[in-house]
């Protein structure tokens, strides 16, 4: 079945090359749609943009219902360090409560992401689809998932918690779920150069 919602995207570019991205989702109130996993954007960037510098929760991966053991701080990491080889391939590497995120090459050139409110982000050399094989799970292991030839970045207003608070299959607690409805998210992408 098709998703019953409208998504409006607005891109505003200033004279310095910064792009303000605003996405607004208007849900069909009559639709019966399950909870959403995330609300945000995904982009494929050149694989050479493999350096991460951000101010948010870290240094380990953390999610809305699993971030109380992480500290707010300024962290420098690589894209390779974001992937955790769980026994079964799955979502990994997300950071929460981010104030700003820089995705650059080793020379310091790339993009900076900022928003008016804290956001979540991740950067992996894997597509989301390669880490989640859908409802019917295959017998495979993380080390068998091939790397993509790009850096896959997700920048999210909100992402559902992991759940599993009383068993492996438990849904997240109510406050960490993303119910189908209207959402709006804006962020700014700014080009950064090491010589500026």
Language-model segments: which ranges?
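Beta-strand/loop-rich accessory regions of lumenal/periplasmic or secreted enzymes
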Residues: 1-196
């Amino acid at each position: 079945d098709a998703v019953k919602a409208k998504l409006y995207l607005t891109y505003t570019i200033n004279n310095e090359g910064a792009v303000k991205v605003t996405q607004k989702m208007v849900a069909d109130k009559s639709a019966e749609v399950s909870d959403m996993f995330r609300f945000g954007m995904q982009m494929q960037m050149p694989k050479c943009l493999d350096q991460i510098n951000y101010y948010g929760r870290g240094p380990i991966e953390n999610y809305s219902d699993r971030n109380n053991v992480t500290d707010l701080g300024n962290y420098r990491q690589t894209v390779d360090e974001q992937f955790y080889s769980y026994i079964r391939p799955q979502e990994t590497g997300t950071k929460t409560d981010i104030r700003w995120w820089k995705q650059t090459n080793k020379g310091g050139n790339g993009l900076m992401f900022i928003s008016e409110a804290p956001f979540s982000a991740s950067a992996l050399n894997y597509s989301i689809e390669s880490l989640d094989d859908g409802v019917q799970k295959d017998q495979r292991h993380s080390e068998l998932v091939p790397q993509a030839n790009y850096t896959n970045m997700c920048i999210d207003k909100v992402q559902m918690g992991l759940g599993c608070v009383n068993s492996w299959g438990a849904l997240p607690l109510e406050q960490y779920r993303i119910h189908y409805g209207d959402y709006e998210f804006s962020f700014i992408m700014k080009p950064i150069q090491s010589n500026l």
